[in-house]
């Protein structure tokens, strides 16, 4: 039911008392700012969740379709992104940590709400009136807490004034209130109190909800806590904290806290860590006067709050300009200083936003680093796997040819070895045969004959004995001939195969294991002639056939002499030359068979790796072109949100210069850094946004280095150019001038060579971090007031694994291979060679060979054909040789910067010493 109360639309900023319109405007501005930045944080979180869902979908075997559109369906419950992990693979570790996601989701879902606690109901009502600037609640009630029955009051925004009873989070009660009966300016007391004699339980539990057309309520809801005797403050705060971010105020009107008040605050602090704003409301009869106590004097209230842990003994209220001040509890005893509530709420809300932005940026940065590391791993896999396969094929072929040579030339040696072995072992074999006890054959002790089947079994066992003993002896001698090959070839091959089978592709893993088994069966077992192996028995199959030709006339008696005779006949029937020929023949046959099986398995492995590498290359492309840039942009937004919250938007000073992609301004002070340079970049399209975001990530990820320009932070200006575009403001260290300007003004030889050393040191550091600058030139080398150099503008800087082969850079500094799209960090060495030409010349004049070029295409064609800067008369021989080495057309012939650096030091020591002794010798000073 609607009440006929007064409208406060025109009075919302001009009410009586110490609240005043200024305080209300500040509060409105603070909560409005929080909502604005919370919206950006919510959008970033939504896009981050969608990013992780897309990652999971694109790299899972099956994925349900994502719901269209935004809203709750798109966001899903907190933590659902990480429930189903990615399958094993390169990106299986990319997921949104559930704890961080839950925390962030809860934060963006909870809007702020001002909660008013207090010593008694009068103080709470009076503080509410001060906040709204109008007399909404009565303040002439009884002071006795025991007689107070104030229910919970909730003030929200609406176009018309309305008062009603409602169960929290449920439904509105149809109940006639006193405020419904007539016009009113102050809500009647009977509507505020709980009628405990009421038979309706819902009426006792209900909140009084007041809807008002008020500027402050348009930004934030206000809840007045009920009387503690009706409901404890801890329970009220617990319910509120589930759905809102409470900004807790505590209204005081006495000089000291009562025992009951201390207990209430002690319980709140025990369960919650929220700071509180303690405000002593003015006495009703002197509402416009201030307290007589000086601010510097500490009241009994202050001491009590220190004892309770809300304030520290050295506590000083943070001033608004201190952006890094953490939200702490405040005590304000001067009524005219109620405006400090805006400072308190600003710090509280800002800290929440900053903490959330930091947590989100940590997730972005961590996953982005994983992407970059995985890109390196994938690039190495693409490069090294084909080389490993080729190496395996080559080594196996060498092993095969070596073993075939052994089989061809060892036949005579093997014959002599067999004859020698037989002669050496003959008596031992005969004795062993005579003393042999047969298995599964019963030999009569009385000398009776046995059947033909038993005789054949006995002969076969004697033959097996001779074969096995002879086999072992021959094998032990033969192994020494080829054992070194097993160590040299098989071990290397097995290690190479082990590296190849580390693939996570199951089919390739099986293929590689099969190949390894083939290798062991074909070479390792056969070469070493392990006893009992199937291969060894096959090699001696012909020996069995020869021995089996032994004949007998009548079934003999099994005696020692008979056993020796059978063994003697078996030994005599062996032909050493035939055995050697048979062994070598089977050896060659087996080698050929194994070689073919190996080659077939290697082709199968190669095919498996080919498919895997194709998928890896596709994934590498996705990481470089889609995943990493998309996540980098989210990271840029979350970090920029953190920076603007902490340090506000920087003020643009005078223009310092313009580049291809942005304008550089002077910025006097930002984030505690002075002075600064501000680079304003308006990305024209998605690609430039992605490049800028990645550049920012690389710069922020780099440790500070004295040869690189520091990046202090970034801010995204959504209203750049009057709202016509969105700009990224990069706030950096400001230096004195660039190298182009320095050379133009004139620098001494020693200074120029020191600049060259500084540049090499900076490039070496970038390379040590896996980055390639790709645009080393005069304008990108800045000088401080001591003319020490720092490298700037990492706009084209990328890790090698993230480079797509795009043609970037400044034409005269671009290495020839840049035009092919296949290059590495040696392009920076080439660019340094050109830069060193300018440094040695002491001038900004273009090399003559480049000056003659009419266009960029003409210049590029000449560079590809080998055109380089000319040698000037002032050049020292060693300097010229260093330039030529650096800009060599073959990247492999360019010196490493670790070699260039000591060469430069040597040149500097020699030339500067010579210059001091003979000023006109060698390089001239351009001063």
Swiss-Prot record:
Domain Protein kinase positions: 650-904
Tissue: Expressed in brain, heart, skeletal muscle, kidney and lung. Expressed in maturing tubular epithelia, with the most prominent expression in the medulla and the papilla. Expressed in thin ascending limb of the loop of Henle and the distal convoluted tubule. Expressed in all layers of transitional ureteric epithelium and in the ureteric smooth-muscle cells (at protein level). Widely expressed. Highly expressed in many brain regions, including in cerebellum, olfactory, hippocampus and cerebral cortex.
CDD domains: PKc_Dusty (cd13975)
Coiled coil stretches, renumbered: 393-429
Top EC category: transferase
Origin superkingdom: Eukaryota
Pfam family, one: Pkinase
GO BP annotations listed: cellular response to fibroblast growth factor stimulus; negative regulation of apoptotic process; positive regulation of ERK1 and ERK2 cascade; positive regulation of fibroblast growth factor receptor signaling pathway; positive regulation of kinase activity
Molecular function via GO: ATP binding; protein serine kinase activity; protein serine/threonine kinase activity; protein serine/threonine/tyrosine kinase activity; protein tyrosine kinase activity
GO cellular component entries: anchoring junction; apical plasma membrane; basolateral plasma membrane; cytoplasm
Function: Acts as a positive regulator of ERK phosphorylation downstream of fibroblast growth factor-receptor activation. Involved in the regulation of both caspase-dependent apoptosis and caspase-independent cell death. In the skin, it plays a predominant role in suppressing caspase-dependent apoptosis in response to UV stress in a range of dermal cell types.
Similarity comment: Belongs to the protein kinase superfamily. Ser/Thr protein kinase family.
Protein name: Dual serine/threonine and tyrosine protein kinase
Organismal lineage: Eukaryota, Metazoa, Chordata, Craniata, Vertebrata
């Amino acid at each position: 039911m609607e009440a006929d109360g007064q409208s406060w639309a025109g009075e919302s900023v001009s009410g009586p008392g110490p609240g005043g319109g200024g305080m209300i405007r500040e509060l409105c501005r603070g909560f409005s700012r929080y909502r604005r930045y919370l919206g950006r944080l919510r959008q970033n979180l939504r896009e981050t969740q969608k990013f992780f869902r897309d990652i999971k979908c694109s790299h899972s075997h099956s994925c349900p379709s994502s719901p269209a559109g935004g809203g709750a369906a798109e966001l899903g419950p907190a933590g659902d992104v990480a429930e189903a992990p990615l399958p094993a693979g390169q990106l299986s570790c990319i997921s949104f940590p559930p704890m961080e996601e839950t925390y962030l989701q809860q934060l963006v879902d909870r809007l702020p709400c001002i909660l008013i606690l207090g010593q008694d109901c009068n103080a709470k009502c009076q503080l509410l009136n001060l906040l709204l600037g109008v007399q909404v609640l009565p303040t002439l009630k009884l002071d006795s807490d025991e007689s107070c029955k104030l229910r919970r009051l909730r003030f929200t925004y609406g176009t018309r004034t309305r008062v009603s009873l409602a169960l929290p989070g449920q439904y509105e009660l149809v109940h006639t209130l006193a405020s419904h009966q007539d016009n009113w300016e102050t809500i009647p007391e009977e509507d505020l109190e709980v009628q405990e004699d009421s038979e309706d339980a819902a009426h006792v539990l209900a909140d009084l909800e007041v809807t008002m057309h008020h500027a402050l309520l348009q930004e934030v809801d206000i809840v007045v806590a009920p009387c503690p005797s009706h409901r404890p403050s801890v329970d009220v705060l617990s319910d509120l904290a589930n759905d809102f971010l409470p900004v807790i105020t505590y209204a005081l009107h006495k000089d000291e806290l009562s025992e009951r008040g201390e207990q209430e605050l002690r319980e709140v602090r025990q369960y919650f860590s929220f700071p509180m704003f303690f405000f002593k409301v003015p006495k009703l009869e002197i509402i416009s006067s201030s307290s007589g106590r000086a601010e510097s004097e500490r009241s009994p209230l202050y001491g009590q709050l220190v004892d309770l842990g809300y304030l520290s003994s050295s506590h000083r209220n943070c001033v608004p300009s201190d952006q890094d001040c953490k939200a702490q509890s405040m005590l304000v005893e001067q009524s005219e200083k109620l405006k400090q509530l805006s400072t308190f709420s600003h710090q509280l809300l800002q800290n929440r936003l900053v903490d959330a932005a930091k947590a989100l940026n940590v997730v972005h940065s961590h996953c982005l680093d994983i992407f970059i590391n995985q890109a390196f791993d994938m690039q190495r896999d693409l490069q090294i796997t084909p080389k490993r396969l080729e190496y395996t094929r080559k080594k196996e072929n060498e092993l095969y040819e070596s073993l075939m040579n052994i089989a061809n030339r060892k036949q005579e040696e093997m014959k002599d070895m067999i004859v020698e072995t037989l002669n050496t072992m003959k008596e031992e074999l005969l004795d062993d045969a005579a003393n042999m006890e047969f298995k599964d054959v019963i030999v009569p002790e009385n000398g009776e004959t046995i059947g033909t089947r038993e005789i054949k079994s006995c002969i076969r066992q004697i033959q097996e004995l001779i074969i096995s003993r002879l086999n072992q002896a021959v094998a032990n001698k033969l192994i020494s001939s080829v054992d070194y090959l097993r160590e040299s070839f098989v071990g290397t091959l097995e290690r190479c195969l082990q590296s190849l089978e580390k693939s996570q592709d199951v089919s390739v893993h099986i293929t590689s294991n099969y190949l390894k088994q083939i290798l062991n069966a074909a070479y390792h077992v056969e070469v070493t002639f392990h006893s009992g192996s199937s291969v060894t028995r096959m090699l001696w199959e012909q020996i069995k056939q020869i021995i089996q030709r032994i004949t007998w006339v009548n079934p003999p008696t099994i005696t020692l002499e008979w056993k020796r005779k059978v063994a003697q006949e078996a030994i005599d029937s062996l032909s050493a030359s035939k055995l050697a020929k048979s062994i070598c023949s089977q050896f060659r046959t087996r080698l050929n068979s194994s070689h073919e099986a190996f080659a077939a398995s290697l082709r199968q492995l190669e095919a498996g790796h080919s498919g895997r590498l194709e998928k890896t290359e596709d994934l590498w492309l996705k990481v470089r072109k889609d995943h990493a840039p998309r996540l980098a942009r989210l990271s840029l937004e979350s970090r920029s949100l953190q920076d603007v919250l902490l340090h506000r938007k920087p003020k643009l000073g005078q223009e310092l210069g313009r580049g291809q992609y942005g304008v550089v301004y002077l910025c006097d002070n930002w984030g505690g850094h002075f002075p600064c340079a501000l680079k304003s970049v308006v990305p024209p399209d998605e690609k430039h946004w992605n490049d800028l975001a990645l550049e920012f990530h690389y710069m922020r990820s780099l440790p500070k280095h004295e040869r690189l320009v520091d990046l202090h932070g970034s801010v995204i200006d959504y209203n750049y150019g009057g709202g016509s575009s969105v700009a990224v403001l990069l706030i950096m260290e400001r230096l004195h001038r660039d190298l182009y300007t320095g050379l133009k003004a004139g620098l001494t030889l020693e200074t120029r060579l020191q600049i060259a050393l500084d540049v090499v040191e900076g490039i070496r550091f970038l390379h040590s971090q896996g980055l390639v600058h790709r645009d080393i030139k005069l304008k990108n080398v800045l000088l401080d007031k001591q003319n020490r150099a720092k490298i700037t503008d990492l706009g084209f800087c990328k890790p090698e694994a993230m480079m797509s082969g795009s043609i970037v850079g400044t034409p005269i500094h671009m290495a020839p291979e840049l035009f092919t799209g296949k290059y590495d960090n040696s392009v920076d060495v080439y660019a340094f060679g050109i830069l060193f030409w300018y440094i040695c010349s002491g001038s900004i004049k273009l090399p003559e060979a480049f000056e003659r070029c009419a266009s960029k295409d003409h210049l590029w064609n000449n560079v590809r054909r080998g055109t380089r800067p000319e040698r000037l008369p002032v050049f020292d021989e060693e300097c010229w040789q260093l330039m030529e080495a650096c800009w060599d057309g073959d990247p492999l012939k360019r010196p490493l910067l670790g070699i260039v650096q000591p060469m430069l030091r040597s040149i500097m020591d020699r030339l500067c010493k010579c210059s001091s002794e003979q000023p006109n010798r060698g390089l001239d000073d351009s001063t």
